[in-house]
Amino acid sequence: MSEIVVSKFGGTSVADFDAMNRSADIVLSDANVRLVVLSASAGITNLLVALAEGLEPGERFEKLDAIRNIQFAILERLRYPNVIREEIERLLENITVLAEAAALATSPALTDELVSHGELMSTLLFVEILRERDVQAQWFDVRKVMRTNDRFGRAEPDIAALAELAALQLLPRLNEGLVITQGFIGSENKGRTTTLGRGGSDYTAALLAEALHASRVDIWTDVPGIYTTDPRVVSAAKRIDEIAFAEAAEMATFGAKVLHPATLLPAVRSDIPVFVGSSKDPRAGGTLVCNKTENPPLFRALALRRNQTLLTLHSLNMLHSRGFLAEVFGILARHNISVDLITTSEVSVALTLDTTGSTSTGDTLLTQSLLMELSALCRVEVEEGLALVALIGNDLSKACGVGKEVFGVLEPFNIRMICYGASSHNLCFLVPGEDAEQVVQKLHSNLFE
């Protein structure tokens, strides 16, 4: 069999009939594209998440109508809509029943079952668009191969099981024609639907590419590649034509939203290049993320992540003692929380948490039970409304004058916390949320323009 390219299209790329057709054009322009991974149509997942929270009848019917209208606007423009009308109606009926159940009692498992319907509908519609072009396209339920644990809302894939199941059930289908499947969703051992967390469709594409030994992953979104920073914050931001895995991973981890942070893990493990382009203008080019690049610059990009919380833990018991940090991290681990940045002194430790939420519902990670456990160990201070700015580069810790070049620009601003030296690829600092955009703009102007 020839090489395999996995193409993933985000919500805006399958938002309506015209967007789906543009995405179909991209798929058909490359004969090596054998597997297509889709998100739900834009807006659908947010509507489903709202339903999963349990709504009063009036609000519930309003959301259900909005979902129907988005999907039927695509369905009715098909030449032969009746071919899949019954299947779409069945999924909409499922959504209605599950939304009624959520109004009585919510649960993470119910939420995952409900929100999975967005991807199920978008993939059915996309397959029919391809078939009306006389393309041999198959719909495939990714839950047959994407085995995960039962941590609903933020499930973790079983890599070994995925590889085995993909070889048995997915690979043979790629020999028969184009396969269309869902991002974001999976299933646990008992067959219950799980999700990989918001933005997990990119991760799905990379995981499937790894399992199928693909030659490349294409991520099609609404921007033509990865930029030196968010163009909505800095209009002078420049596209990066080629970037190394390590640099892109730092950018994704610290807030650049073009790629889901976990996307690059399978790509790095299996050395699979990732291309990022715009489905609205595929000829505009994009960014290739690969193992290494020639002559990487000292400063590569700036990433911004809002809604950060700083926890400062004070305890005199830290003084000349052992095991305090182990206890703190044990508590955080029990609450499934990972720490971003950390600084310590003799009697205190400060650490940052990304509290925007990374479950399918977007719930905050900073719960009362977590704070109570920490308070039993030490005095806890919580500061919210902060933003994390990360300067991404190469060998930053070995270069002379980086501190002067960066912090000279930041003199007018209050810097709440700095992390530097643990990685040669980043210099991170925490600033008040209201200053974040100005900080990024000034740094970009001085370092990149």
Swiss-Prot record:
Changing residue 8 to R: Reduces activity about 98%. Increases KM for aspartate about 40-fold, enzyme is less sensitive to lysine inhibition. Substrate binds at residues 45, 119, 198-201. InterPro entries: AceGlu_kinase-like_sf (IPR036393), ACT-like_dom_sf (IPR045865), ACT_Aspartokinase (IPR054352), ACT_dom (IPR002912), AKiii-LysC-EC (IPR041745), Asp/Glu/Uridylate_kinase (IPR001048), Asp_kin_monofn (IPR005260), Asp_kinase (IPR001341). Belongs to the aspartokinase family. Homodimer. In the inactive form a homotetramer is formed. Aspartokinases I and II also catalyze the same reaction(s). PANTHER family: ASPARTATE KINASE, ASPARTOKINASE. This is Lysine-sensitive aspartokinase 3.
